[in-house]
Amino acid sequence: MPKICYEVRGEYALFTNPMTKTGGDLHSYPVPTCSAVTGLTESIYWKPSIKWKPLRIRILNPIRYQSRSKLLPVYKTGGKDLGYYSYLRDVCYQIEVEMAWGSERYASDRNVAKHYESMLRWLRRGGKLPVHLGITECFAYVRPCLFGDGEGYYDAVDMDFGVMVHSRDFEKGVIRLAPYRMHQGVICFPDQEECITRTGRAGGD
């Protein structure tokens, strides 16, 4: 199946852990999760007959955080409380994904060339839907690219980010976890079968 490469950049990003997303404070993972990359890609182009499998991501800019306070509603009292969000700042990634077939119910729409060309067309336009980096207030800009093109801040760096969320199964209430390791600026996403599974909350990215 065909692969697509694109660059995504934004002023802010916030990729949260759905198992610890409680209260008014949010802290971003240092890099996008596999499920966040899936959501990014589906915002560019998606149909029920296809799905996108994230393969790898290249981290181009330094990983930097910036904290901001926010007034959040307290629904029990009707008042407001102060929460702190810890965002990633000035992010830029190169992403490679592979097209795969989606639901069998839409097998009649399995036209590789049509979906590939539609994806490229919407990618050049900046996405069919608004593209966000983790949460809706973090707007993103996308464009086609050649994976590995240009210089990246971590091109000579290896780094271990520990175990992070890989993806989720909302119907089963399962969260998949996987170790995230960067080699020369690139993180390769493992297959779902290689992940550790946990039962937990299914909100956030």
Where are these regions (language model features)?
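Beta-strand elements of well-folded, non-transmembrane domains
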Residues: 8-14, 61, 95-103
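Extracellular structured ligand-interaction cores
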Residues: 3, 54, 90-94
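Short, flexible N-terminal segments of the mature chain
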Residues: 20-40, 117-130
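N-terminal, Lys/Arg- and Ser/Thr-rich interaction peptides
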Residues: 1-24, 183-197
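Internal, well-folded beta-alpha domain core
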Residues: 72-205
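Surface-exposed beta-strand edges and their flanking turn/coil or helix-capping segments
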Residues: 18-23, 65-74, 108-110
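Glycine/small-residue-rich interface belts in oligomeric ring/scaffold proteins
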Residues: 27-67
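Short, hydrophobic/aromatic beta-strand segments
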Residues: 17, 52-53, 106-107
